[in-house]
Amino acid sequence: MALATTIEKFGSLSDHELLRVKELMLTVWPKATFYTFEYLDWLYRLNPAGKAETFNVWKGNSIVGHYAAIPIVANLFGHEERGLLSLNSVVHPDYQGRGYFKSLALSTYEEAKLRNAGFVIGVANAKSTLPCQRQLKFQKVSPLTVKLGFGHVKRKTEPSASPCFNVKWEEANLDWRLKRPGANYRVTSNSSGTWLWGGTGTHGIYAEMGWFPTEARQLSSVLSQVDAMSTIKSNPVKLWIGLDQRCEWPGYWYCVLPERFKPSPLNFLFKDLTNFKRFLDPETAQISLLDFDAY
C-alpha cells in the first residue's frame, strides 16, 4: 500500500530533518551546491533572532515539500517589530500541483503569529512573485533596483523621509549573518561610513551588501573582523541591488542593468500578519543584499 503524505511542523530541527531537506533541495536544484548541512544549520538553527519557522510534507521517511522562513527584527512604520524573512519553498517534482506551496506557507505564518510575528517579507523572481501575490496575498512593494558601476555609492545624510521599513542590524545578528558558510566578505571605509561587500561568483565583481554610517559605532567591532579590501580600485566593478532612497546616484558611474542581465530575485514582497492591513511605501522602504540571503 502506498504511503500517505502528511504535513507537519518541522519539529525539533534535528540533524535528520535538516539532511532530508538538503536532499530535497539538491534533487530539485542540483546546481545549488551551497545547500549543505552546514549552511542549513547556520540558517535554521543558529540565528540569534530565533529558529526557523518551517513546515514539511513527509512521504514515509522523506521530505517531498518544504517551506521555511527565518525570524528577523525590523523598524516598521517607526516601531521595532518582529517578523519573518521568507526564504525556501520547494516541492519535489512528483508532488507539485497539489497545493502544497500555499498550505505550507500559510501554516508557517499562523504558527509564527503565535510568537508575535507581525509581518513577512521576501524577495522573489518574476516566476515566484505572481503565486505569492495570488495565493498568499503578498504586496509587491517594488522591483529591486539593480545597477552596475564603480566605487562607493554615497548616501544622503538627511533623507527626505524616514523609511517605512528597514531591517534592524545589531551586533548579534550581524555577527551571525557574516558567518554564512561559504561567503566571502570584504569591507571598505571612509569618513562617512563602512561598506560591506560580498563576492558574486563572477571574478572581479563584488556586490554591496550594506552600508553602515559612521554613527553606527556599536557595529564596528563586528565589522572589524571582516577582511578589508585593499582599495576600492583593486576590485573596481560593483553590483548594487536593493531599495534605498538615501542613495545619491547622480555623479556616480553606475548604470541600470538591462533586464536580460539581472540576477534573480528581483521583487521585494511584503505581507502584513496583523489586522491593520498595512502596506509599504516603495518610495521609503529600504532593503539591501544583507537583508536577504543572496550572497
Please give the residue ranges for each predicted region.
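A short beta-loop-alpha structural element at the N-terminal edge
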Residues: T6-V21
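Amide-forming acyltransferase catalytic core, primarily the GNAT-like/NAT-type
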Residues: V21, M25-L26, A32-P48, W58, ...
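Catalytic micro-motifs at enzyme active sites that drive phosphoryl/nucleotidyl and oxygen chemistry
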Residues: Y44-R45, P71-F77, Y109
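Short, high-confidence coil segments that cap the C-terminus of an alpha-helix
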Residues: A52, L114-A117, A183, T231-V237
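Conserved beta-strand in the GNAT
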Residues: T54-N56, S62-I72, L85, V90, ...
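Short coil/turn motifs at secondary-structure junctions
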Residues: I72-A74, D94, K127-T129
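Conserved acetyl-CoA-binding loop-helix of GNAT-fold acetyltransferases
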Residues: V91, Q96-E110, A216-M229
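Active-site/acyl-donor-binding loops of N-acyltransferases
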Residues: F119-S162, G201-Y295
